């Protein structure tokens, strides 16, 4: 169990002060937990605090009974933590197995036999056994992400934190990566931080939305979808003029009879032929951001 209480983080420079997190309160249990929000919402700051890399300005984090406020607590948490940041620096001239072995040494796995077994185990888990001796510099972006997950798993963590893991991946690698995370979540807590709504929809049963450093939604993906009930429509137009009148265009589909728009907004009076449709997670997210006064530019 992770308990985050009244957590705030302020960055101060000579020219300005930035409140990255503002009184965040969350409880996170076992399984996949999704943290969704736009770029700049404070997600990475929160992940770095949980990983013990950044100290909060205020508040407390307790993970499995250990507080990040104390040196002993931070040490205990790091021993059971795996972390994949947005940008993981890798030694490109090393092979995958050499890099994971190096990371295992840094994580305190001193027993050579145990380390060899763990390296083989995690490379197999992420589907890289056949490429274990290849140099990382020859890997695709998706393969490098899987190396990143492997190094995060090498100490068999109870808590795995992954920050924007699918950004920049092609559709096939994104699906592969999501499936990998779901398979790993049976035995541990995984926090998936992302701005990609589909990643949450396909992996998580519990989630929160962060915006401007504050939690603006906490619940299930189904609960977020319900937020948009009565505010999502489908409208087909033979005109190239894009629907407006305070509506957000979530998607456009070109059909023989015209362009089919999926719209989110408070009123559809200007388009009497529009039909109400069942919200998806992206619709719920767009409606939530609109209702909180946040700018949403989907298309």
What is the role of each PLM region?
Residues 1-4, 10-23, 71-73:
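A short, flexible loop at the N-terminus of ABC-type nucleotide-binding domains that lies
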Residues 38-42:
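Walker A (P-loop) phosphate-binding loop of ABC-type ATPase nucleotide-binding domains
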Residues 51:
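Helix-to-loop junction immediately C-terminal to a conserved catalytic motif
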Residues 59-70, 76-77:
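Conserved ABC transporter NBD signature motif
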Residues 101, 105, 113-131:
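Conserved ABC ATPase "signature" region
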Residues 160-164:
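Catalytic Walker B motif of ABC-type/P-loop ATPase nucleotide-binding domains
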Residues 176-263:
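ABC transporter nucleotide-binding domain
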């Amino acid at each position: 169990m992770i308990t985050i209480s009244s957590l705030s983080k302020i960055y101060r420079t000579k020219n300005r002060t930035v409140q990255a997190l503002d009184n965040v309160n969350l409880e996170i249990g076992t399984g996949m937990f999704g943290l969704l929000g736009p770029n700049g919402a404070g997600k990475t700051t929160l992940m770095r605090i949980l990983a013990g890399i950044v100290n909060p300005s205020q508040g407390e984090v307790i993970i499995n009974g250990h507080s990040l406020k104390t040196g002993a607590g931070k040490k205990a948490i790091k021993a059971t933590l795996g972390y994949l940041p947005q940008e993981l620096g890798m030694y490109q001239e090393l092979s995958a197995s050499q890099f994971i072995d190096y990371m295992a040494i840094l994580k305190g796995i001193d027993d050579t036999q145990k380390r060899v077994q763990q390296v083989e185990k995690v490379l197999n888990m992420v589907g890289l056994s056949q490429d274990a001796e290849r140099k990382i510099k020859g890997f695709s972006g998706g393969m490098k992400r899987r190396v990143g997950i492997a190094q995060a798993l090498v100490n068999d963590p109870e808590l795995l934190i992954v920050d924007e893991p699918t950004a920049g991946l092609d559709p096939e690698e994104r699906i592969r990566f999501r499936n990998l995370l779901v398979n790993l979540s049976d035995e541990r807590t995984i926090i998936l931080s992302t701005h990609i709504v589909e990643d949450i929809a396909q992996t998580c049963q519990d989630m929160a939305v962060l915006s401007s450093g504050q939690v603006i939604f906490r619940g299930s993906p189904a609960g977020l979808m319900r937020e948009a009930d009565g505010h999502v429509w489908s409208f087909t137009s033979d005109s190239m003029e894009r629907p407006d009148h305070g509506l957000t265009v979530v998607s456009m589909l070109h059909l023989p009879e015209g362009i089919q728009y999926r719209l989110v907004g408070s009123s559809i009076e200007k388009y009497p032929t529009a039909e109400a449709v069942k919200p998806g997670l992206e619709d719920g997210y767009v409606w939530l951001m609109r209702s909180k006064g946040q700018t949403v530019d989907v298309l």
